[in-house]
Amino acid sequence: MKKYISMMAMALMLSWGFTACDVETDEEPGGTNIEQMCGNWDVMWYAVDASGNVLDEWTDGTIFTFNKADNSTTQMWIDDQNTYWAFKFLVDIDYNAKTFSATERDYDAAGSGKAVVTNGKILLGAGKNLHGAPCDSITFEISFDDDSYPAKYGFDHYRVEGVKHAGFTE
């Protein structure tokens, strides 16, 4: 009898142990203050002339946009993860208009050169991924003061356009 009571007590304690680990909460994790402008973007780089006419598809790449550690609503990071020009710097944003720009900013921590970003926009739901599903899109123009390609190949700056990465293999 003692054996059965011990087994029942052990089973009861184990069941309490499993339910004690079950945390239920109505707490929402939330997001950042600029959540709609942040993301991983699959982009195409275009060579454009001073009038904004596309002269050539230059290359494809990846761009990341993300918030600052202080969760600022006036600036965000833009980073190409070394897929083209190896830049990572802060751009000024207008979150309500979903626009961004930067005037003469060091584009990396080493101070290799300066970048200028103009006409930056995040367009919510305006893009389509490769499967035709709607997604957010990004567009901006950028130039680098240490870039010899524009003079060498006869264009003025780059236009970068793309869509938010869906997380699926495209």
Where are these regions (language model features)?
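Positively charged n-region of N-terminal signal peptides that target proteins for export
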Residues: 1-4
